[in-house]
Curated annotation (Swiss-Prot):
It is found in: Cell membrane. It comes from the Bacteria. The lineage of its organism: Bacteria, Pseudomonadati, Aquificota, Aquificia, Aquificales. One of its GO terms (cellular component) is plasma membrane. The chain crosses the membrane at residues 4-24, 28-48, 60-80, 156-176, 209-229, 240-260, 268-288, 309-329. Its main location: membrane. This is Putative transport protein aq_740.
């Protein structure tokens, strides 16, 4: 093939590949989630397929398990959380309408911890009682409540789209389980790269997905459950919302769930009492944060080893650029890049190829 023919071929191939990916762009999230779940659930699919001797039936049963064990419970949890957010918002509005800023400042002055520091905090307390702060507070509360209301309305309006994305996710997962091995072989045979190098990259992606799933997500779920129990026993209102916040905070290094429970514990000690503060301190120190120090290393030690700073930026960058799915995409991109650098050093620098 001469250079002109090669150029024409590559031009048409890359052009239509770009158009195809552009068509898939609206379904990016459900497709990526389907790939992630396909990687994790493929051993289960293989086990069921060997028992039933049917690819279609095995894939359908895995989809049914995902629907019953993950999709439906998550939907119920989302509805309950939305209800608690609405109740919380109503309580905030009622509190603002029935209490003045001066009432709030006077109640703060009665907190034992602040009584001792009253003289040094007097300028701050005077500012908090000023008309300037009152206007700023009202504007901030209006902005927050408007944002919450807009988000809830958008979720209601896009319920149909969300259901369609769930359908796309389940449909894609079905075909990934049933035909994924065949498609993967075709991709491997079509990429002009040494087979062992390509397999190393694919194994890196596989190990990264499993490490993130079992390590990070598993730890976050365990921490949010322990957090919900601790918040409930300590008398924290809207414990389910705080447990949900704890779940997402668990993905943020370096402190994870401690970003939530430590400030909450300080609040309990200074406002509720020593008993409530000690309850959450026990749960936070010995149960919530211990999950991060024990569960995650045990699960991820057989997976990937990434530089901590690089992992921090890849996770945060993934969250910012791709949303929650970025928790997976960030480390995958990082680990694949490092694997590619390793291959480059082995093939090009050391071998001179």
């Amino acid at each position: 093939m001469n250079k002109l023919s090669l150029f024409v071929y590559l031009f048409f191939f890359l052009s239509f590949l770009f158009l195809f990916l552009y068509l898939l762009q609206p379904f990016f999230n459900p497709i990526v989630w389907a790939i992630v779940f396909g990687i994790v659930l493929y051993p289960l699919y293989g086990f069921i397929k060997r028992k039933l001797k049917s690819e279609n039936l095995a894939a359908f049963l895995v989809i049914f398990i995902v629907l019953v064990a993950i999709v439906i419970p998550f939907t119920i949890f989302a509805v309950i959380t939305a209800q608690q957010i609405i109740v919380f918002s109503i309580k905030v509005v009622n509190f603002v309408q029935t209490h003045s800023v001066n009432d709030l400042i006077n109640s703060l002055k009665e907190i034992p911890f602040l009584k001792e520091k009253r003289e040094s905090l007097e300028p701050l307390l005077n500012y908090l009682q000023s008309e300037e702060f009152r206007r700023a507070l009202i504007n901030a509360l209006n902005s927050i409540l408007t944002f919450v209301g807009d988000r809830l309305r958008s979720y209601v309006y896009t319920a149909g789209t969300s259901l369609f994305h769930v359908f796309v996710f389940l449909l894609t997962l079905f075909f990934i389980l049933r035909d994924g091995e065949k498609v993967l072989k075709e991709i491997i045979n079509s990429i002009p790269m040494k087979r062992e190098d390509l397999e190393e990259i694919l194994k890196t992606i596989y190990r990264t997905v499993l490490a993130v799933i079992y390590g990070t997500v598993g730890t976050a779920v365990a921490q949010s459950i322990m957090g919900f129990i601790g918040y409930s026993l300590a008398g924290v209102e809207f414990a389910l919302i705080w447990a949900l916040i704890t779940f997402f905070a668990a993905f943020v290094p370096p402190f994870g769930a401690a970003f939530v429970w430590v400030p909450m514990d300080i609040y309990l000690f200074t406002t509720k009492g020593i008993k409530e503060g000690l309850i959450l301190l026990f749960f936070g120190t010995f149960l919530i944060s211990t999950m991060d120090n024990i569960v995650r290393p045990l699960v991820m030690k057989q997976g990937i080893k990434l530089p901590y700073v690089a992992l921090f930026f890849s996770t945060i960058g993934g969250l910012i650029k791709f949303g929650f799915i970025g928790v997976f995409l960030g480390p995958i991109i990082l680990s694949t890049m490092l694997a590619s650098v390793k291959i480059y050093r082995r093939r090009v620098i050391h071998s001179g190829i």
